[in-house]
From Swiss-Prot:
Transmembrane segments: none annotated. Its EC number is 3.4.19.-. This is 26S proteasome non-ATPase regulatory subunit 14 homolog. Metalloprotease component of the 26S proteasome that specifically cleaves 'Lys-63'-linked polyubiquitin chains. The 26S proteasome is involved in the ATP-dependent degradation of ubiquitinated proteins. The function of the 'Lys-63'-specific deubiquitination of the proteasome is unclear. It comes from Arabidopsis thaliana. Component of the 19S regulatory particle (RP/PA700) lid subcomplex of the 26S proteasome. The 26S proteasome is composed of a core protease (CP), known as the 20S proteasome, capped at one or both ends by the 19S regulatory particle (RP/PA700). The RP/PA700 complex is composed of at least 17 different subunits in two subcomplexes, the base and the lid, which form the portions proximal and distal to the 20S proteolytic core, respectively. Ubiquitous with highest expression in flowers. There is a cross-link at K238 (Glycyl lysine isopeptide (Lys-Gly) (interchain with G-Cter in ubiquitin)).
Length: 308
C-alpha cells in the first residue's frame, strides 16, 4: 500500500508523490560484516563453476542503513535459482535453529554468486528479488563473484528492483540527497543487463570493530614454529636430489661462462650475456636454499627425537 501511495501520490495519479510518504534514497548503504563476507566468498568459491545461493540475516537500522551480520547457505545450486526453487521449509527450520544459538536477526535479503561473469541480475534473479520484496520492500539482493575477487579487492554489489510503474510515470526510483550512491561506476555488462532500468545498485560498506580487525590480521599470520615444521622424508629426499642435479647443471654453465670471459673481449662479452641465465646467481640461490632446508629439517628431527 505504501508503494502504491508513493507511486500515484496525492496528485490524482499525476506522478507527484506525497511529501509524507517514505522515499528511498541514493545514500542508502548496506553494511556487511566480516563474518558474512567471508562466508559468502567461501560458499561461492566452493560452488565454482556453479552458482550458489543463500540468505542474509541482519536488520534495517534506519532509512539509510541496512546491516548484514550473518549469512547461511541454501541447498540450491546451478542455474535453477528461481522463485519456485527457494526451499521455504529449510529456511524456516534454519531460522529457528539460529535463534536457539543466539542469532535472532531477521532476513534482510539474499545473495548468490556469479562465478567469473561479474555482478548483475538476470531475469530469473529479478523475479527472485521481487518475491523477496513482496515480503519486505527493502529486501536486498547481493551478487558476489568469487573468481574475479582477489586479495584486497572483492567483486561484490547489492541491488534492488525498480517498480516498472515508476518508470512509466516518469519518476525517479530514488531521491538524491548526497553523492554516496554515485561513488561506484557501473560496469558495461551490468548496464547491458538492465542496471538502472530494471534494478538499481546500492552502495556497500564494511564496518569492523577492533576484535574483527585483530581476527582478520591473524588469519595468515606466521608463527616461529612454522619454520620447524617437518616435511615428509621421501619428499625432502626427492627435493634434495633434484636441487643437486640443477646445481650440477648450473656449475657446468658457470664454468663455461668463466672460460668465455678469458677468451672474449669486454664488448663481445656484454653482447653474449644478454638474455642468458646468470648461472652464478642461480647457483648461489640453490646452495643457500638447500643448506637452509636441510638445517631446518635436521634441527626439527633432533627436537622431535628429544621431546617425543
Amino acid at each position: 500500500m505504501e508503494r502504491l501511495q508513493r507511486i500515484f501520490g496525492a496528485g490524482g495519479g499525476l506522478g507527484h508523490a506525497s511529501p509524507d510518504s517514505p522515499t528511498l534514497d541514493t545514500s542508502e548503504q548496506v553494511y556487511i560484516s566480516s563474518l558474512a563476507l567471508l562466508k559468502m566468498l567461501k560458499h561461492g568459491r566452493a560452488g565454482v563453476p556453479m552458482e550458489v545461493m543463500g540468505l542474509m540475516l541482519g536488520e534495517f537500522v534506519d532509512e539509510y542503513t541496512v546491516r548484514v551480520v550473518d549469512v547461511f547457505a541454501m541447498p540450491q545450486s546451478g542455474t535453477g535459482v528461481s522463485v519456485e526453487a527457494v526451499d521455504h521449509v529449510f529456511q524456516t527450520n534454519m531460522l529457528d535453529m539460529l535463534k536457539q544459538t543466539g542469532r535472532p536477526e531477521m532476513v534482510v535479503g539474499w545473495y548468490h554468486s556469479h562465478p567469473g561473469f561479474g555482478c548483475w541480475l538476470s531475469g530469473v534473479d529479478i523475479n527472485t528479488q521481487q518475491s523477496f520484496e513482496a515480503l519486505n520492500q527493502r529486501a536486498v539482493a547481493v551478487v558476489v563473484d568469487p573468481i574475479q575477487s582477489v586479495k584486497g579487492k572483492v567483486v561484490i554489489d547489492a541491488f534492488r528492483s525498480i517498480n516498472p510503474q515508476t518508470i512509466m510515470l516518469g519518476q525517479e526510483p530514488r531521491q538524491t540527497t548526497s553523492n554516496l550512491g554515485h561513488l561506484n561506476k557501473p560496469s558495461i555488462q551490468a548496464l547491458i543487463h538492465g542496471l538502472n532500468r530494471h534494478y538499481y545498485s546500492i552502495a556497500i560498506n564494511y564496518r569492523k570493530n577492533e576484535l574483527e580487525e585483530k581476527m582478520l590480521l591473524n588469519l595468515h599470520k606466521k608463527k616461529w614454529t612454522d619454520g620447524l615444521t617437518l616435511r615428509r622424508f621421501d619428499t625432502h629426499s626427492k627435493t634434495n636430489e633434484q636441487t643437486v642435479q640443477e646445481m650440477l647443471s648450473l656449475a657446468a654453465k658457470y664454468n663455461k661462462a668463466v672460460q668465455e670471459e678469458d677468451e672474449l673481449s669486454p664488448e663481445k662479452l656484454a653482447i653474449v650475456n644478454v638474455g642468458r641465465q646468470d648461472a652464478k646467481k642461480h647457483l648461489e640461490e640453490h646452495v643457500s636454499n638447500l643448506m637452509s632446508s636441510n638445517i631446518v629439517q635436521t634441527l626439527g628431527t633432533m627436537l622431535d627425537t628429544v621431546v617425543f
